[in-house]
C-alpha cells in the first residue's frame, strides 16, 4: 500500500522527449518538464543511455540550468565531486540511514532543481524514496493545525555541529573548513557573523552553529505551499555533539 507504480506518474523516454548531449532543450520541452514537476513533484527519465558521471553531466547540461556547486553550498554531508555539476550523494557507509529531508533546507541557500542518477545499483535496497511535500503539508495541517500555524509564523532555527576534520562515517560529517569554505577559525567566525549565524567552539576543535530563523513552509512561486524544512531528518537522526540543551 502506498507504493507508486509507473501509472502514477510520467516516465520520460527518448521517444517522448529526445535529449542530445551538447544540444540545449528548447523552451517548449522545458515547459513540459516544468509542468510535470509542478503536477507530480518529480519526473523519471529512463533509457537515455547514461552509464557514467560524465554522461549524467552532459544530460544535465541540456537543461541549461545555473550550476549550484557543492563547494558553495552549506551541505552537512561529505560528498565528492565527480564533475563540475555532479557530486556523490553522501560518503557515509551503507548502514547509515539517510532520512527523508529537503535538500539543504537548513541553510540560507539551496538548489532549485535536483537530478539523481544511479551509477552503480546497490546490492540490496538503495532506492531513493520521494515524498510530496505539498501533500505532507495538507496532512499535517489536518492533524496539527496549531503546529503548522506556528511554523508559518516563526520558521525554524537549526543547530548542528561540524567537526574540524571530515567524518565520513557520519551522514553529516563535513568539516567546518570545507562547509564554510575557509582555512582558519577567524575566517569561519567572520563568515558565520556575516550570515547571521550564532556559534561556539567545541573543546575538540569542532564548531556548533545555529542558523537564523528560516522558513519552514513556502510556495516557491508555484502557487501551492510545501512543507520545506529539516524537521523530520533533525528529529530522527541529527547528532549534535555539543552539550547545548
Report each predicted region and the residues it spans.
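Non-heme Fe(II) oxygenase catalytic core, chiefly the N-lobe of the double-stranded beta-helix
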Residues: 2-245
Amino acid at each position: 500500500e502506498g507504493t507508486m507504480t509507473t501509472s502514477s506518474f510520467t516516465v520520460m523516454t527518448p521517444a517522448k522527449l529526445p535529449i542530445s548531449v551538447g544540444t540545449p532543450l528548447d523552451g517548449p520541452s522545458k515547459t513540459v518538464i516544468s509542468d510535470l514537476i509542478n503536477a507530480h513533484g518529480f519526473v523519471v527519465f529512463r533509457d537515455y543511455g547514461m552509464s557514467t558521471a560524465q554522461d549524467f553531466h552532459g544530460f544535465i547540461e541540456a537543461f541549461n540550468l545555473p550550476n549550484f556547486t557543492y563547494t558553495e553550498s552549506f551541505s552537512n554531508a561529505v560528498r565528492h565531486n565527480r564533475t563540475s555539476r555532479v557530486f556523490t550523494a553522501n560518503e557515509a557507509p551503507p548502514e547509515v540511514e539517510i532520512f527523508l529531508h529537503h535538500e539543504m533546507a537548513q541553510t540560507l541557500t539551496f538548489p532549485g532543481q535536483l537530478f539523481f542518477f544511479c551509477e552503480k545499483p546497490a546490492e540490496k535496497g538503495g532506492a531513493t524514496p520521494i515524498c510530496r511535500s505539498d501533500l505532507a503539508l495538507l496532512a499535517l495541517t489536518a492533524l496539527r493545525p496549531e503546529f503548522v500555524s506556528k511554523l508559518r509564523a516563526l520558521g525554524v532555527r537549526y543547530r548542528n555541529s561540524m567537526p574540524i576534520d571530515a567524518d565520513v562515517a557520519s551522514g553529516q560529517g563535513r568539516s567546518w573548513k570545507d562547509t564554510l569554505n575557509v582555512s582558519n577559525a577567524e575566517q569561519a567566525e567572520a563568515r558565520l557573523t556575516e550570515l547571521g549565524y550564532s556559534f561556539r567552539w567545541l573543546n575538540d576543535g569542532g564548531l556548533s552553529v545555529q542558523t537564523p530563523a528560516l522558513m519552514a513552509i513556502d510556495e516557491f512561486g508555484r502557487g501551492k505551499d510545501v512543507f520545506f524544512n529539516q524537521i523530520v531528518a533533525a528529529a530522527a537522526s541529527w547528532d549534535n555533539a555539543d552539550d547545548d540543551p
